[in-house]
């Protein structure tokens, strides 16, 4: 216990000292959480403190290096608005230097089913963390409880609460299932391709109920499962159950990604409606999605956040003294009328970014209500940009316009560096492919130029959200935050998250719109503004 306390104190001290260094790196994201220093990966233990009005985010954390390594801790951050985060001292530490406090979740034990609490702890703050203790010999599920609202934790003396004689059994995600008055856990038998479902009365004794196995993309292993009831967009009083599973390695685009299944849950078994794997985010940098145990109802009931990186290259990204960021928090719903193609409707996960900003520049409108030609490109300079921008674009394709398939029929946006315009992001839509593309390779940063896994070009299929008067309309919202880009198509029916890296200090702030064809694209609205 003395060694554990010493490690805990060292990590907390390092986190506090590094707070002084936060502003030394000019390209740190403004509205995506990053640790003050050290390595970060999976989000863990997400919950909302209804007493204090505060959100809690824990995460896999190595304070001693900028690459993954043991011992691995639970880092901690808090927020009042889900956008601006305050780094907190380490919350959970492993017992040994060759071990890790691996991923897990948090619950609020309002009714004290665990008997860890007395009346001095507000029921809204009765936090119990369920996490994987990893050693070279095994992975076992532990619980720890907090008596101070989630800042420090005491380990349950009779841990582990669940073991399987395996080194590949991890990532417990726990929620309360009201109809049966039981706790439900999903945990990954990673290399058996199983998500096992357990139930418990007290968080201490667990019963295996069923397994969801060998479904969707298998890759190398399953990780970071989650099961949550998600309301429908058309009628929020109705809902379906969604099973999230992370895959690494083995993503179709390389490395790591998240898939999901839509179905029903009866308290013991999850049954997918069609067993078809669906993709949560089509970018390269969105992994280990976890949803919040509870929320402020004004934000909705299904909120989640993911690690904004990819295991293929995460150890090499050019940031210092930290490495990795989180995505924005997203509000999830299910679009039960998603038009996958002209003949098929599907149930589709919809994502809406949570972004609370009070200090932003004015929206700059240009090219709106105009038809693009090769001769009339549009541009705007945000000369004081710090590199965090958001934009909204609504455009239409003229379906009566005949264009040769051999012509690259693009609408392109160019976000160029203010100090060096030879560094830029190019993104846009190509009509023949009906896809939105991104080129993040136009950088002088060595990592971008030389790392073969950092895919420079990628695309996402897009379908119009409406068609009228021979025009097919598309919509995209984008947030560029220093070195991470989130794109939401047609109000979040499709999402793509990707990191990018420019020379330090070369903030993106010059925006150009061009096309390679005449009279094909109609711009209904385009606006951009700086986020400060």
Curated annotation (Swiss-Prot):
It catalyses: Hydrolysis of terminal non-reducing beta-D-fructofuranoside residues in beta-D-fructofuranosides. GO terms for molecular function: beta-fructofuranosidase activity; sucrose alpha-glucosidase activity. PROSITE patterns: GLYCOSYL_HYDROL_F32 (PS00609). Keywords: Glycoprotein, Glycosidase, Hydrolase, Signal. InterPro entries: ConA-like_dom_sf, Glyco_hydro_32, Glyco_hydro_32_AS, Glyco_hydro_32_C, Glyco_hydro_32_N, Glyco_hydro_beta-prop_sf. Residues 1-19 form the signal peptide. Its EC number is 3.2.1.26. It is an enzyme of class 3 (hydrolase). One of its GO terms (biological process) is sucrose catabolic process to fructose-6-phosphate and glucose-6-phosphate. The active site is at residue 42. SMART domains: Glyco_32. Substrate binds at residues 39-42, 60, 102-103, 170-171, 223, 311. Glycans are attached at residues 23, 64, 97, 111-112, 118, 165, 266, 275, 356, 369, 384, 398, 512. SUPFAM superfamilies: Arabinanase/levansucrase/invertase (SSF75005), Concanavalin A-like lectins/glucanases (SSF49899). One of its GO terms (cellular component) is fungal-type vacuole. Pfam families: Glyco_hydro_32C, Glyco_hydro_32N. Gene3D superfamilies: Exo-inulinase, domain 1, Glycosyl hydrolase domain, family 43. Belongs to the glycosyl hydrolase 32 family. PANTHER family: EXOINULINASE INUD (AFU_ORTHOLOGUE AFUA_5G00480), INVERTASE 2. This is Invertase 4. The gene is SUC4.
């Amino acid at each position: 216990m003395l060694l554990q306390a010493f490690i805990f104190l060292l990590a907390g001290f390092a986190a506090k000292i590094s707070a002084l260094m936060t502003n030394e790196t000019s390209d740190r994201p403004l509205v995506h959480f990053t640790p003050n220093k050290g390595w970060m990966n999976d989000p863990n233990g997400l919950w909302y403190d209804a007493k204090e009005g505060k959100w809690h985010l824990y995460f896999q954390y190595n304070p001693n290096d900028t690459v993954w390594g043991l011992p691995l801790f639970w880092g901690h951050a808090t927020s009042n608005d889900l956008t601006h985060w305050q780094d907190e001292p380490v919350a959970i530490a492993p017992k040994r230097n060759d071990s890790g406090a691996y991923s897990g979740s948090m619950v609020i034990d309002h009714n004290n089913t665990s008997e860890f609490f007395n009346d001095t702890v507000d029921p809204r703050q009765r936090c119990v963390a369920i996490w994987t203790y990893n050693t070279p010999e095994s992975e076992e599920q532990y619980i720890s409880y907090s008596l101070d609202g989630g800042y420090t934790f005491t380990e349950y003396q009779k841990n582990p609460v669940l073991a399987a004689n395996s080194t590949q059994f991890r990532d417990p995600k726990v929620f309360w299932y009201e109809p049966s008055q039981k706790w439900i856990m999903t945990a990954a038998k990673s290399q058996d391709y199983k998500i096992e479902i357990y139930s418990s009365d007290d968080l201490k004794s667990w019963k295996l109920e069923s397994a969801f196995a060998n479904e969707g993309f298998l890759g190398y292993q399953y990780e970071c499962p989650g099961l949550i009831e998600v309301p429908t967009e058309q009628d929020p009083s109705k809902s379906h159950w969604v099973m999230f599973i992370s895959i690494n390695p083995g993503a179709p685009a390389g490395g790591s990604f998240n898939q999901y299944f839509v179905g029903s849950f009866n308290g013991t078994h999850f049954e997918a409606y069609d067993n078809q794997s669906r993709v949560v985010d089509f970018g390269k940098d969105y992994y280990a999605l976890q949803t919040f145990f509870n929320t402020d109802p004004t934000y909705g009931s299904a909120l989640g956040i993911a690690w904004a990186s990819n295991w293929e290259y995460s150890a090499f990204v050019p940031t210092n003294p930290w490495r990795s960021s989180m995505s924005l928090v997203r509000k999830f719903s299910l679009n039960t009328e998603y038009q996958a193609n002209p003949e098929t409707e599907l149930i589709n996960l919809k994502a809406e970014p949570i972004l609370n900003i009070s200090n932003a520049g004015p929206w700059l409108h240009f090219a709106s209500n105009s038809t693009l030609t090769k001769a009339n490109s549009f541009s705007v300079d945000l000369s004081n940009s710090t590199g965090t921008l958001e934009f909204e674009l609504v455009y239409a394709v003229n379906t009566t316009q005949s264009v040769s398939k051999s012509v690259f029929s693009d609408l392109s946006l160019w976000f160029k560096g203010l100090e060096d315009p030879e560094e830029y992001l190019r993104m846009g839509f190509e009509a023949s492919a009906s896809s939105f593309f991104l080129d993040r390779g136009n950088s002088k940063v060595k990592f971008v130029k030389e790392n073969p896994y950092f895919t420079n070009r990628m695309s996402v299929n897009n379908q119009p959200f409406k068609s009228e008067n021979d025009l097919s309309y598309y919509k995209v919202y984008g947030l560029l935050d220093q070195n991470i880009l989130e794109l939401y198509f047609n109000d979040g029916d499709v999402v793509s998250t990707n990191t990018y890296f420019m020379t330090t200090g070369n903030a993106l702030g010059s925006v150009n719109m061009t096309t390679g064809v005449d009279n094909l694209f109609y711009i209904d609205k385009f606006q951009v503004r700086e986020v400060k």
